[in-house]
């Protein structure tokens, strides 16, 4: 049920390219039009050439160097301007295929335009919410939402969807509640009017003080394995993180380029689990989908205004928050403009977390999994 807001937006984040991005859309889907018979020529169209070329070009040059191939395949603006229907977004918070930045903050943009929208955001990945066996296989991942099993199983989701269709397509039944059902990585479901929610408290941690460097130097090398690791002091109380955390890092580079990957972990001693990550091609250091202003390498500095992929995580008292900076990670390609990136610690480099008070929230327990072998 995962949906796209655009083709480029699916496979690029702040200019950084997933490994599949340069060739998948046209190299894979486009190949369905070619099967080696004499009728192939009837299926040929310019996009078979333009598409892969644009994909490779977006990685090499950081954007659409010529033409409007990607712009034609961006859908969200037309939905916001023209759509008169309803939207029910069902999204896995750890979907490796359709990342949650397709749905967050899209859900709020829809609501702000008056479009009747609801969200069901659980800790599954690219699976249906009621597939017990597939979700069970995630339960020993060590993070990435696997710890939310079995509470992530939603046997009621298709009934919910049926009632949505009955109301909006047939006028039967009653109007659904237009809220967001969001699950934390520890399994608890709660109701939010919007997501990210508005009633949050920002916690700011400075690199070098609140987050102490515990290993590595200040340089991030373009080898995907060398960079600094920062860690907080043990938390005095439970921390509940939601939405789109930010990492603003002041850096200098050896060339006009480079890339930063940030891994955020919840650590109990040396036992750490993944709770979130962010990535940025530094040519996009101001954030967003447009190339940013240039800078002078070596002597000049820029602030990489990174935004994490949407997350909802609980970090318990006594645990620490660990931040690792590398040149790439997950399934992202190294930057075409690889460079040594030097982290400037201090007030210009901060991790910004949006937290909430669970006692202020409406929580509930969905239908419980009773599968005797798995739950």
Annotated model-derived regions:
Residues 116-204:
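C-terminal catalytic histidine-bearing segment of alpha/beta-hydrolase fold enzymes
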Residues 22-59, 130-151, 291, 367-375:
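Surface-exposed intrinsically disordered loops and tails
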Residues 83, 89-91, 95:
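Short beta-strand/loop motif that positions the catalytic acidic residue
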Residues 1-82, 172-177:
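Accessory cap/linker subdomain of secreted extracellular hydrolases
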Residues 84-87, 113-118:
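Loop/turn elements at helix/coil->beta-strand transitions in domains of secreted/extracellular proteins
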């Amino acid at each position: 049920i995962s949906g796209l807001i655009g083709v480029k937006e699916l496979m690029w984040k702040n200019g950084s390219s997933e490994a599949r991005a340069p060739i998948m859309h046209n190299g894979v889907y486009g190949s369905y039009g070619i099967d080696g018979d004499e009728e192939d020529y009837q299926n040929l169209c310019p996009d078979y050439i333009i598409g892969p070329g644009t994909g490779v070009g977006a990685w090499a040059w950081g954007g659409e160097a010529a033409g409007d191939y990607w712009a034609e395949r961006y859908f969200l603006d037309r939905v916001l301007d023209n759509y008169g229907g309803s939207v029910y977004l069902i999204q896995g918070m750890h979907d490796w295929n359709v990342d949650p930045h397709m749905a967050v903050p899209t859900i709020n943009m829809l609501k702000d335009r008056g479009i009747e929208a609801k969200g069901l955001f659980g800790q599954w990945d690219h699976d249906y919410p009621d597939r017990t066996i597939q979700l069970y296989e995630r339960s020993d991942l060590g993070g990435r939402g696997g710890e939310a099993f079995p509470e992530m199983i939603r046997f009621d989701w298709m009934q919910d969807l049926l009632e949505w269709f009955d109301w909006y397509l047939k006028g039967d039944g009653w109007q659904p509640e237009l809220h967001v059902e969001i699950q934390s990585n520890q399994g608890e479901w709660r109701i939010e009017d919007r997501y990210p929610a508005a009633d949050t408290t920002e916690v700011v941690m400075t690199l070098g003080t609140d987050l102490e460097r515990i290993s590595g130097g200040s340089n991030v090398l373009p080898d995907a394995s060398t960079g600094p690791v920062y860690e907080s002091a043990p938390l005095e109380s439970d921390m509940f993180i939601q939405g789109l955390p930010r990492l603003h890092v002041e850096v200098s580079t050896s060339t006009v380029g480079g890339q930063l990957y940030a891994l955020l972990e919840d650590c109990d001693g040396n036992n750490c689990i993944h709770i979130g990550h962010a990535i940025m091609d530094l040519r996009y250091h101001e954030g967003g989908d447009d190339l940013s202003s240039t800078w002078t390498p070596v002597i000049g500095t820029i602030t990489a205004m990174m935004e994490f992929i949407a997350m909802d995580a609980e970090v318990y008292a006594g645990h620490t928050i660990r931040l690792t900076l590398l040149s790439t990670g997950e399934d992202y390609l190294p930057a075409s403009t690889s460079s040594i990136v030097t982290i400037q610690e201090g007030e210009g480099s901060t991790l910004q977390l949006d937290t909430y008070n669970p006692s202020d929230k409406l929580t509930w327990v969905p239908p419980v999994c009773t599968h005797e072998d798995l739950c």
